[in-house]
């Protein structure tokens, strides 16, 4: 069914593309690419333009995850460069800059607001998905991973080398390493080990002048900025060198559901009191979602409690019985498995699914909207009930992720990297809704806005914090071709808190003319930033 829908999607896009408004002349840019690229690595086959409708369209759609922003007919899109070598990246930067063309950098295509493949000014997409090499050194417990590799590919590569090493990153196997790591990616190991950026020890980046830099040549300030501040404001991330972490051979996982009729609200309230205080080895996510009720046509809220424990069932049961008996966990709810198999469990794949599924790069275009929040104090039961009531207004898939903090997240200083959301948070919230009918877009965005407003009294304030990797244009943005510092401070302080000033300082030194920009990039205008106590 998905394949049929995707085929129809391509046909409709091709029809629109053939009738599109003529795009600006990209000839000078293309000629520059051919001149700048290394003769040993010809770039011609890496360039896709509208002149070849089929290949251009396939390249565009394959890594465009949010249909809400999919627009290959955009007259400003001059070309897609699918880099196969570092020289292709360098040539794209040099030629785009010299021709006054904006670059949008796309690794996995998971940018929630489409900023890696959409612009209202002339631009090119620099697609990194073919730069996906991964090397694992078990003896040093380190790995190099290129920006275009997916988390699934990284996890499989680590598992092939060792069953007692892992990397603390996200649960979505198709996310690209370039953007995920640079924004402070997290997963179910974060209470034990922190976020992705806490384990980056080197990086390769192409700067605004087309130079290839590493940690030594870029300097510690820029290296600090790209770990949590997002790489796309500072250059093009080519690869990361990461520390791997030691894990046991056996993990325990479970999934337990509680509907409202089963006392779900009371259980979630208690979860808020204990989830951030569990031993670091335990990550227990609460996932409220809309489900069908027991009666025909009835809908209710079910809270799915997903857990991962670095250890055996016996120890986990002891912790749960002592600290969270309200959940009613039974031994038969638990499954023991390897770290790699936990990634399949979190992907909701059945037991026995081959690990090769993590290597897939499926294209399932859907409409979706996501937002984020940070919670400092337990949400009262009446607040939870207001949230449930608003969720039930959706007529499509909607869920929240309550991701517990505590553990290592409390022990890493907020300025150790550019990712600032550390001690003081009980949990992070992700709001998510998805749909297939384009006619439902306006209604779903409206309800999502209402849900966000309903939650406002119960989350962080001054500022209302947000997670950069859950990009949300609603919290502030600039036009594609401009970066006003006052507007940038609105979204920048929500994403980066007290680290914003240093990020803008780094930007002023590394990209003073603001070549690398998008609607939510970091501006280089340090002189106009107020003091920290004024932000």
Swiss-Prot record:
List the Pfam families hit by this protein, alphabetically.
BBE, FAD_binding_4
Q: What induces it?
A: Up-regulated by MKK4.
Q: Which residues get glycosylated?
A: 52, 214, 257, 292, 321, 341, 415, 439, 444
User: Site of the 6-(S-cysteinyl)-8alpha-(pros-histidyl)-FAD (His-Cys) crosslink?
Assistant: 110-172
Q: Which gene encodes it?
A: FOX1
Q: Where are the transmembrane segments?
A: none
- Keyword list, A-Z: Cell membrane, Cell wall, Disulfide bond, Endoplasmic reticulum, FAD, Flavoprotein, Glycoprotein, Membrane, Nucleotide-binding, Oxidoreductase, Secreted, Signal
Q: What does this protein do?
A: Flavin-dependent oxidoreductase involved in the biosynthetic pathway to 4-hydroxyindole-3-carbonyl nitrile (4-OH-ICN), a cyanogenic metabolite required for inducible pathogen defense. Converts indole cyanohydrin into indole-3-carbonyl nitrile (ICN).
Q: What is this protein called?
A: Berberine bridge enzyme-like 3
Which coenzymes or cofactors are required? FAD
**Location of the FAD-binding PCMH-type domain:** 73-247
Instruction: Report, from the record, the phenotype seen after gene disruption.
Output: Three- to fivefold reduction in levels of ICN metabolites and accumulation of indole cyanogenic glycosides.
Q: Which family does it belong to?
A: Belongs to the oxygen-dependent FAD-linked oxidoreductase family.
Point out the signal peptide segment: 1-19
Q: What kind of modification does the protein receive after translation?
A: The FAD cofactor is bound via a bicovalent 6-S-cysteinyl, 8alpha-N1-histidyl FAD linkage.
Bound cofactor: record note: Binds 1 FAD per subunit in a bicovalent manner.
Disulfide bond as UniProt keyword: yes
**PROSITE patterns under this entry?**
FAD_PCMH (PS51387)
Provide a GO CC annotation, any one. plasma membrane
């Amino acid at each position: 069914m998905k394949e049929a829908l995707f085929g129809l999607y391509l046909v409709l896009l091709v029809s629109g593309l053939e009738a599109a408004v003529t795009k600006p002349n990209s000839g000078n840019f293309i000629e520059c690419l051919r001149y700048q690229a290394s003769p040993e690595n010809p770039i011609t086959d890496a360039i896709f333009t509208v002149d070849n409708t089929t290949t251009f369209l396939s390249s565009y759609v394959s890594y465009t995850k949010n249909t809400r922003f999919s627009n290959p007919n955009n007259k400003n899109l001059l070309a897609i460069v699918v880099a196969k070598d570092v020289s292709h990246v360098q040539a794209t930067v040099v030629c785009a800059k010299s021709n006054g063309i904006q670059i949008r950098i796309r690794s996995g295509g998971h940018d929630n607001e489409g900023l890696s493949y959409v612009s209202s000014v002339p631009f090119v997409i620099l697609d990194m998905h073919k730069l996906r090499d991964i090397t694992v050194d078990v003896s040093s417990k380190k790995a190099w991973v290129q920006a275009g590799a997916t988390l699934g590919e990284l996890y499989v590569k680590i598992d092939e080398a060792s069953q007692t090493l892992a990397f603390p990153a996200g649960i979505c196997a198709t996310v690209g390493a370039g953007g995920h790591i640079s924004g402070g990616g997290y997963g179910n190991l974060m209470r034990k080990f922190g976020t992705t950026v806490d384990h980056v020890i080197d990086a390769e980046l192409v700067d605004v002048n087309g130079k290839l830099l590493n940690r030594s040549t870029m300097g510690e300030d820029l290296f600090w900025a790209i770990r949590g501040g997002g790489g796309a404001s500072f250059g093009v991330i080519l690869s990361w060198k990461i520390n791997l972490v030691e894990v046991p051979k056996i993990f325990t996982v479970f999934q337990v559901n509680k509907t409202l009729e089963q006392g779900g609200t009371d259980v979630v309230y208690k979860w808020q009191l204990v989830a951030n205080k569990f031993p670091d080895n335990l990550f227990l996510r609460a996932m409220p979602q809309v489900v069908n009720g027991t009666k025909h046509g009835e809908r209710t809220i079910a809270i799915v409690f997903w857990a991962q424990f670095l250890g055996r069932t016996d120890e986990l049961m002891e912790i749960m019985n002592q600290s969270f008996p309200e959940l009613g966990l039974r031994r038969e709810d638990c499954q023991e498995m390897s770290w790699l198999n936990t990634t399949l469990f979190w992907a909701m794949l059945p037991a026995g699914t081959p690990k090769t599924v993590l290597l897939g790069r499926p294209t399932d275009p859907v409409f979706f909207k996501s937002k984020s929040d940070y919670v400092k104090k337990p949400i009262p039961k009446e607040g939870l009930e207001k949230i449930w009531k608003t969720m039930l207004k959706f007529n499509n898939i909607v869920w929240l992720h309550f991701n517990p903090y505590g553990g290592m997240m409390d022990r890493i200083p907020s300025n150790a990297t550019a990712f600032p959301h550390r001690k003081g948070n009980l949990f992070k919230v992700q709001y998510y809704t998805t749909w297939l009918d384009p006619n439902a877009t306006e209604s779903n965005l409206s309800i999502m806005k209402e849900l966000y407003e309903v939650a406002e009294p119960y989350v962080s304030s001054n500022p209302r914090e947000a997670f950069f990797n859950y990009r949300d244009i609603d919290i502030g943005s600039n036009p594609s071709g401009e970066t006003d510092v006052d507007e940038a401070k609105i979204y920048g302080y929500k994403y980066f808190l007290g680290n914003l000033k240093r990020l803008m300082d780094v930007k002023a030194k590394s990209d003073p003319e603001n070549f690398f920009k998008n609607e939510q990039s970091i501006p280089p205008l340090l002189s106009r930033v107020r003091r920290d106590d004024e932000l």
